[in-house]
Amino acid sequence: MVGLPPDMGQTAHSLFGGDPAAHPYTPQMRKRHLLIEIAQTVALTVVAFYLLQAFIAQPFRVEQGSMRVTFEPGEYVLVDKLSPRLTGFHRGDVVIFHPPESWPSSSDNTPYIKRVIGLPGETVAIGADGVRINGALLTEGYVYLDGGDNVEEPQSWRLAADELLVFGDHRSNSSDSRAYGPIPASVVVGRAVIRYYPLDRMSLITPPPYGTAVP
């Protein structure tokens, strides 16, 4: 073992920390250390928040009345942005999307909220008896008629592999695919999964049962 001369040993001792009593952890150092920890925590929280909103989930305020009475203007929903990318969309999903070029958009580009009616590859027709998917009549218990009837001008669509047909539940007061055509799935922000405000209407949002006639 190689030793150091006494004076060299004292010099090394002082360079690499020395006696803790000789270098006390002052209140100023504690304060600086605490501020650094707080800044790191805030930075990580901000990054996590933006990553969460960008890729996983995002709150959304319902602005339009086209989904009455399922959703009222002013209600808040949580939008799942991740699972649709993994599993795709299902009939009855309530989706939030940015209007494609063929749709009108507001000056502030407010997203739309609608219900998925037609899925990629399907033939959807509407008429006096309602909506038909590949010839099978769709039972829609959520449709709000606002005291009127649901007489539709006959139309039909054959959806491409990346298209969705979306309607509002308030059929007499909804600007949707009936007027502007299908939307590409790429414009969809995500699927509404929870209504969290107002508290007395808090609920999970799940696709309605359509029975066995329509897959």
Name what the model sees in each region.
Residues V2-Q40, L51, F55-R61, R68-P215:
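Soluble "head" domains of membrane/secretory-pathway proteins
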